[in-house]
Amino acid sequence: MSEDKPHQNLAVIGHVDHGKSTMVGRLLFETGSVPEHVIEQYREEAEEKGKGGFEFAYVMDNLAEERERGVTIDIAHQEFDTDEYYFTIVDCPGHRDFVKNMITGASQADNAVLVVAADDGVQPQTQEHVFLARTLGIDELIIAVNKMDLVDYDENKYKAVVDEVNQLLEQVRFNTEDAKFIPTSAFEGDNVSEASENTSWYDGPSLLEALNDLPEPQPPTDAPLRLPIQDVYTISGIGTVPVGRVETGILNTGDNVSFQPSDVSGEVKTVEMHHEEVPKAEPGDNVGFNVRGVGKDDIRRGDVCGPADDPPSVAETFQAQVVVMQHPSVITAGYTPVFHAHTAQVACTIESIDKKIDPSSGEVAEENPDFIQSGDAAVVTVRPQKPLSIESSNEIPELGSFAIRDMGQTVAAGKVLSVNER
C-alpha cells in the first residue's frame, strides 16, 4: 500500500450492462494493477465460454458463479494508483436486487464514476444510483459516457446523453458544476488513460486524469472512532478477527473499544491491513483486527466498533429525513420495512410521519400528513425492531445515512436528524 499518497474510495455506479465492470477492469489494466498473464488467462477463459471481450470484466468477477451468469454481484475491492492518489474501487453492481450493496458500498465512497452507455442513455437504475449517491453524500461525480464505439464516436449522441444526465442531476439538486463528462469506451480503451483519436471533438481530460484531479478527501480523523463490522472471522493462532472499514476516527493497537449494539468491549491487540500488521488504521482503511476477550459469537455484522469511553449510539428511536423513491402505494405510520445502515440490516417501524417537505425548496409542505408516496420527502420518527447502532448525520455523517428496502427494491433513502438513545 502506498503510504505516501492520499487514499480515495471510488464507487463505480450506473445501470446494469452499461459497462461498469469492463470500465473497472480497464482502469486496473491501464494502471498496471493486473498482471498481463492474468489478463491473458481471462481472455482464453472468456473465449472458451463464448464471451469474448469480457476479459476485463473477468478481472472483477472472481466468483465462478458470477462468471457463468455474466453478472457482477458482491462489492469487489480493487486497488490502483494514479500520480496523486491510491484508489480502492468499490465496484457497485447494477442489477435490481443489488441496490443494497450499492448503499453499503456508496456510503463508503468518497467520489463516484457514473457509467452511462451512449447507446442507451439514462435508465431507471441510473436515476436511482445518482439519487442514492446524492443522499449518501458523494459530492464529486465523473460521468463516463461509455460504449462510444457502439455509436461510432458520434459527438451528437454524446451531447444528447450529457444533456439527459445534467437534467437528472438538476432534479436531485446535484451541483452540475461538480460533474465532469468524458466520452469513453471501456472495451476499446478510448479516453480511459489517454486521449483518443476517435473523439477528436473532445478536448477534456481522460478518465484517469479526471480521477487524478479529484479534490483530496478530508479524512474525519477528529471524530470519534466508528468502524462498522462487515464480517467476523476466526483465524487459527490469532482468534476472533472482526473486519470492516474505518469510517471516522483512528483505531490504534492498545485501544479499549466497545461494539454496539452487542455491548461487548475489550483491548485491541493487533490491526492488519492488506495482510500486513499496522500500528493504527484511519478513515477509509479496510482492516481486520483482534480484540482481547471478544469471541466470534459476541459480535456480528452490523455492530459498530468505537471507543469504550465514547461508544457508538444505539437508537431506541430516531428522527430522519427520507425521500421516497418508489413505492407501489402509500407509506403510512406503522409501515415496517428493512433499514440498511452501514453494514446493518434491521426491520424498523415508521412510528409517525412528522412533516412533508417540498423536495425542491426544502420547506415544510404539511405537518403530520396521513401518508407519503413516491417522490415525496418527509421527516419521520423511526423505531428499530431490534437494536441498531446509528448516528445523527450532522454529528457523524458517515454513519447517519440509510436505505429503506421492501419487496426486493429500494423504496426510500434518508439521513438521520437525531437519535433518541436506548
UniProtKB/Swiss-Prot annotation:
Residues 14-21 are annotated as: G1. Residues 70-74 are annotated as: G2. It is found in: Cytoplasm. PANTHER family: TRANSLATION FACTOR. Residues 91-94 are annotated as: G3. Residues 185-187 are annotated as: G5. The lineage of its organism: Archaea, Methanobacteriati, Methanobacteriota, Stenosarchaea group, Halobacteria. It is an enzyme of class 3 (hydrolase). This is Elongation factor 1-alpha. Mg(2+) binds at residue 21. GTP binds at residues 14-21, 91-95, 146-149. Residues 5-221 form the tr-type G domain. Residues 146-149 are annotated as: G4. Its EC number is 3.6.5.3. One of its GO terms (cellular component) is cytoplasm. It comes from Natronomonas pharaonis (strain ATCC 35678 / DSM 2160 / CIP 103997 / JCM 8858 / NBRC 14720 / NCIMB 2260 / Gabara). GO terms for molecular function: GTP binding; GTPase activity; translation elongation factor activity. It catalyses: GTP + H2O = GDP + phosphate + H(+).
